[in-house]
Design a protein with these regions (language model features):
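A short, charged
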Residues: 133, 226, 270, 337-340
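Acidic surface patches and DE-rich sequence motifs
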Residues: 265-267, 294, 329
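Alpha-helix boundary/capping detector
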Residues: 123-124, 213, 324-325
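Amphipathic alpha-helical protein-interaction segments
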Residues: 1-210, 291
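Acidic, Ser/Thr- and proline-rich intrinsically disordered linker/docking segments
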Residues: 287, 292, 299, 303-359
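Eukaryotic alpha-helical scaffold "rod" segments
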Residues: 30-40, 249-270, 341-359
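Intrinsic-disorder/low-complexity loop/linker signature
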Residues: 14-18, 264, 270, 332
């Protein structure tokens, strides 16, 4: 009978039977084996139970109540995990086993509650893996749960399921409509809302934008900007014009001495000390403006200047993976533009599509 499995009895001599702990342990193994060999609980009598224990000098008492409750819990786990209806024979066996083990009513309630919770977790997981025969409403009815009773568990099961799949989404940095539809269906099957924490929502929105940039058909935008005949705009976004510069700064040690007001500017002879300088390359933001991507040009406009480059005059672009796209032209000039974090990757993908005429 499930879930019990035959256990091998420990060998012991006469004196260990009389004075040792092994007989007690063998008594519980004997009872376990009785349950394992039976077709069902109904085929076992109270005399069978006591006889199995008696040969090892074991009797029911308050001290071994936890051992009996543990045996009951094993069947309770199976019953609540596999039962299909409230009058399922598994529950009748469970009730009979409680009588055979002479469990107190409160012990039965505690074991049932724990088994019910564990089974609810498992059956919710089986719903998501398409292994469960009942839907969530039928399981709630079987367990005597209302909507709120199992809501926290259902959310927890979905979150664990989502986290595993989210790792692949992050790795690919893409979130397709099919993936979203799958998650929404999972939430529907568990009867929970489709919702995430703000940081997850932001990440999913970013990955969806990248997926759209690669797969959606490009639609022209209406913009207040004079374009050439036959020219249409596909992207308009705020940006910043940047430039790579080499700057000098003081060594970190001397910056630290100034921070703590340590005077090291004068030596013992009264001569001023020159702090060592370190040169480093930085990407400096020069000004803010607007970026436009059309079917023939990239355009940058600000209050101070305008820059337009034909796509045919550009050899390509690089993306730093964060927010800067560098456009390279045939004159070996670089045009660095800084975009909002959520837009930079999209601009880079759309530029490549438009330049390669994959519209």
């Amino acid at each position: 009978m499930q879930p019990y499995k035959i256990q091998e009895l420990e060998k012991c001599g006469l004196f260990s039977k009389l004075f040792g702990s092994t007989p007690t342990e063998n008594g519980w193994k004997e009872l376990n084996n009785l349950l394992a060999q039976a077709q069902d609980v109904a085929s076992i009598s109270a005399d069978d139970v006591h006889s199995a224990l008696k040969k090892w000098g074991v009797k029911f008492n308050e001290e071994n109540l936890p051992r009996r409750a543990a045996l009951y819990r094993q069947l309770a786990d199976v019953s609540f995990t596999d039962a299909q209806t409230s009058d399922d024979p598994l529950f009748a066996q469970l009730k009979r086993l409680a009588e055979l083990l002479e469990l107190h009513e409160n012990q039965v309630k505690l074991a049932d509650k724990s088994a019910r919770t564990a089974a609810y977790f498992q059956r919710c997981r089986r719903i998501l893996s398409n292994e469960e025969k009942l839907d969530i409403n039928s399981i709630n009815e079987l367990f005597g749960y209302d909507y709120e009773d199992g809501l926290a568990i259902r959310k927890q099961v979905f979150q664990a399921h989502f986290n595993l799949l989210f790792e692949d989404i992050v790795k690919e940095a893409r979130y397709s409509p099919e993936q979203e539809a799958g998650f929404r269906k999972d939430c529907e099957r568990l009867d929970i809302p489709y919702e995430f924490k703000n940081n997850i929502v932001s990440a999913l929105n970013k990955y969806r934008s990248l997926w759209d940039a690669e797969n959606r058909k490009l639609e022209p935008l209406d913009i207040d900007l004079p374009l050439e005949k036959g020219e249409v705009c596909y992207v308009h976004v705020n940006c910043g014009l940047c430039q790579n510069k080499v700057v000098e700064r003081e060594d970190n040690y001397f910056e630290l001495t100034r921070k703590f007001n340590i005077d090291e500017t004068v030596n013992f002879k009264g001569e001023k000390l020159e702090h060592p300088k370190i040169k480093e390359e930085i990407t400096a933001l020069l000004e803010l403006g607007h970026f436009f991507l059309t079917n023939t040009r990239i355009i940058y406009l600000s209050q101070k200047q305008a820059l337009a480059k034909r796509l045919d005059d550009l050899t390509g672009a690089d993306f730093d993976g964060i927010n800067i796209v560098t456009f390279h032209d045939k004159d070996k000039q670089e045009h660095l533009l800084k975009f909002p974090d959520e837009a930079a990757g999209v601009v880079y993908i759309l530029f490549k599509r438009v330049k390669n005429k994959e519209i």
